[in-house]
A protein has these predicted regions:
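Glycine-rich, Arg-bearing micro-motifs that act as flexible, cationic patches
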Residues: 431-456, 470-471
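Activation segment signature within eukaryotic-like protein kinase domains
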Residues: 117-118
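Activation-segment/catalytic-loop signature of the eukaryotic protein kinase fold
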Residues: 81
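Conserved short submotifs of the Hanks-type protein kinase catalytic core
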Residues: 85-99
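AlphaC helix of the eukaryotic protein kinase fold
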Residues: 47-69
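Small/aliphatic-rich secondary-structure junction motif
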Residues: 320-375, 482
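Protein kinase catalytic-loop region centered on the HRD/HxD motif
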Residues: 123-133
Length: 482
């Protein structure tokens, strides 16, 4: 699709597009109406321009998967969505109320008000966590206080993780995603599974709203982000002499590096914020200065191995002999590959019949030049990444039996084989299925992607070849790239 083609006055799937309400780096928000719906509606439309991060597309896809599964007053009600084969969008309830971003000019807020806001946000997080979702981007602009009731509602689930859905962001990208001031240490290290990451972010918000200062600033780059793993923040009582010990106890507990030392649940955090006199005080409540430099050096160069061990133990492990393996299917989308496509689909179908609980990940590599400058849009202004994603989904349409057990990933790399191998290793893939190049002198001299994957993969690899009758016209494109 072309970049952001939806304009005021357009009709999309029965929705009349109204005024532009907000335009951000990754998406725009527009008011929409439909004759059969009387409540105010909001349409979220991804922005895809030259040079945009493909993670924005994947994040939008995740939000389309997660939002329909959520319910209750603490999230916007899902109405409809348009997939990537046409103009992609999400239509949801337009919540009446203001985001906490509007309160920044009033900081620092009274302590009682900070605690009241924090308790409401913690209750919203508890409701979200009970629905199997970690938000992973809790910040003032993503929290709306509903008019009338004052309940907190969480918005923007582009970085969220649902523990019953594939984590497309975590599988496809190796860099941490989030908003720098609010990211939890484990999130920076690539762990997106822990609900207590949201409690850390809420702790940052509580510190900020009660002191007017962000505890870790607004760091740029991963190295500066990682400082919070070993450098503790200035205690709030150092910044404000009248800061209540009970509130410092709660805030610094939220900001513990190891999640095990934070509140076990958002509900317990909400209880403490609502009952300050019942909060059990520890040494945290008395701190007036940061840890001495010796302790910082110890944490920096001799980290808490128990923390690392717990994170490693929590990592999902799937044995190659499991009855529910992860199968990666590397697909060449070049024109003229339909006979090979049919053979690949037939192979996938046989695996599905043998292992009905298998999960499939369809891969395609968008190959970048090693020296030349690549563009993210094609000659018609469409996102190359998005076009490949749509083509992958079209490839899988005949495999109707897969439905919710198949995901789609466009990898971007100068080396297709390396990209496939890295994906397989990172995501503990048990079986790779891919097509082979047609026989040729060039393939003999330079080798092939399939040969490299077979030689280096740590899992089973099935290479699908066409009978020689098809080989002559099969082309020279490597698997999973073009």
């Amino acid at each position: 699709m072309a970049a952001n083609p939806i304009k005021t006055g357009a009709t999309i799937d029965g929705f009349l597009v109204g005024e532009l309400l907000h335009k951000g780096g990754m998406a725009s928000l527009r008011a929409v109406t439909r004759p059969d719906i009387t409540v105010p509606l909001l349409m979220k439309i991804p922005t895809m321009l030259e040079g945009d991060d493909p993670a924005a597309i994947v994040g939008f896809e995740m939000e389309q998967m997660i939002l329909p599964r959520l319910s209750g007053i603490h999230v916007p009600k899902f109405v409809a969505a348009g997939d990537f084969s046409g103009p992609p969008y999400i239509v949801m309830e337009r919540i009446a109320g203001q985001t906490l971003l509007r309160r920044l000019d009033d900081l620092p807020l009274p302590y009682a008000e900070v605690a009241a806001i924090g308790a409401k946000v913690a209750l919203a997080l508890d409701d979200l966590h009970r629905q199997h979702v970690v938000h992973l981007d809790v910040k003032p602009s993503n929290i709306v206080m509903r008019e009338g009731t004052g309940d907190a509602a969480l918005v923007d689930f582009g970085l969220a993780r649902h523990d019953q859905l594939p984590d497309l962001l975590g599988e496809e990208f190796r860099v941490p995603y989030g908003t720098a001031p609010y990211m939890a240490p484990e999130q920076i290290l690539g762990d997106r599974r822990d609900p207590r990451s949201d409690l850390f972010a809420l702790g940052v918000l509580l510190y900020f709203f009660s002191t007017g200062v962000r505890p870790f600033g607004d760091p740029k780059g991963k190295r500066r982000l990682q400082r919070r793993l070993w450098r503790d923040p200035v205690p709030p009582r150092k910044r404000r002499a009248d800061f209540p010990p009970w509130l410092q106890e709660i805030v610094l507990r939220c900001l513990e590096v190891d999640p095990v030392h934070r509140h076990p649940t958002a509900a317990q955090l909400a209880f403490d914020l609502a009952h300050p006199l019942e909060t059990k005080l520890t040494g945290r409540s008395e701190r007036m200065k940061r840890d001495p430099i010796g302790a910082v050096i110890q944490r920096r160069f001799h980290p808490d191995f128990a923390f690392a061990a717990r994170r490693q133990a929590a990592a999902p492990r799937v044995s190659a002999s499991s009855t529910a393996p992860i199968v990666a299917v590397a697909i060449d989308l070049a024109e003229g590959s339909e006979p090979l496509h049919e053979a690949l689909r037939a192979t996938v179908q046989r695996i599905l019949e043998t292992l009905p609980d298998a999960r499939f990940a369809c891969l395609n590599v968008l190959k970048h030049h090693r020296i030349a400058i690549d563009t993210t849009l094609d000659e018609e202004g469409r996102s190359k990444h998005l076009t490949r994603l749509v083509e992958l989904k079209q490839w899988a349409q005949p495999l109707a039996a897969l439905q919710n057990r198949i995901t789609f990933h466009v990898l971007e790399s100068t080396d297709p084989a390396a990209a496939i191998l890295e994906y397989a290793q990172t995501n503990r893939v048990d079986h790779i299925v891919m097509g082979a190049r047609a026989s040729s002198t060039l393939r003999t001299l330079l080798g092939s992607v399939s040969q490299e994957v077979v030689a280096k993969a740590a899992c089973t690899v099935t290479v699908v070849r066409l009978p020689r009758a098809f080989d002559a016209g099969a082309g020279e494109s490597p698997p999973a790239t073009r």
